[in-house]
Amino acid sequence: MNQLIHIYHGSQEIVRQPEYGKGRRHNDYGLGFYCTESEELAKEWACSSLSDGFANHYLLNLEYLSVLNLSSAEYSILNWMAVLISNRVFRPGTPIAGKAKRYLEENFAVNVNAYDVVKGYRADDAYYDFADAFLNNAITVEQLASAMKLGKLGEQIVLKSRLAFERNQFVDFAVADSSKYLPARKARAMQAETDFRRISESDSDGLYMIDIIRGQVKNDDPRIPRNISE
């Protein structure tokens, strides 16, 4: 990763000076400032209603910052899952889902708060259904990985520490036209529903969550898909 990177934050507001410690704690990677390296994706994220939004543009200096890249081959999709369920609001509806949550947190957890910056997939609400289905033993880990790749969710870059905020400089902003980007956002959600039905109904001989628990599968198991950004 380059030392200087351009990042974008989609919002209903122009954010010239992001505030450290502000935001929602139950986002994918906990409290932080959520951005992407794609201006187009930021514009889509900015348009959640009929109102236009903004893609706020920043230049982030990564020198001296510790970066956790959950999309690298060092981590598996279950590391990503463990981080996700530790931060997003997840209420297990079945005994297997409760056991799955505990097992993943105990065996695949990654401390994102130990880093200045976190890079990894964004699990929007449409694709969170896949994570829920996996925890409830409805799809395999291979099907989960396939869904994440097909979804093209885009990677997000999250500023976690005060130092990261200090090394982030506002450049400018661009208007996100809701007439263009809101339909794109809705189309992504509709595609997620289509993918979910197709993948969940397909046959798979892979690993279900119950197999992972019973087999005491760990993070170094070669059967667990890695580097899901490829």
What are these regions (language model features)?
Residues 2-3, 49-53, 62-230:
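Conserved NAD+-utilizing ADP-ribose enzyme module
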Residues 1-28, 56, 222-230:
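ADP-ribose/NAD+-binding catalytic cleft of ART/PARP-like enzymes
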Residues 24-49:
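Extended catalytic/binding region for NAD+/ADP-ribose chemistry, centered on the ART fold
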Residues 5-9, 33-34, 55-57, 156-158:
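Ordered hydrophobic segments in well-structured contexts
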Residues 12-13, 39, 62-64:
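Short, flexible loop/turn elements at secondary-structure junctions
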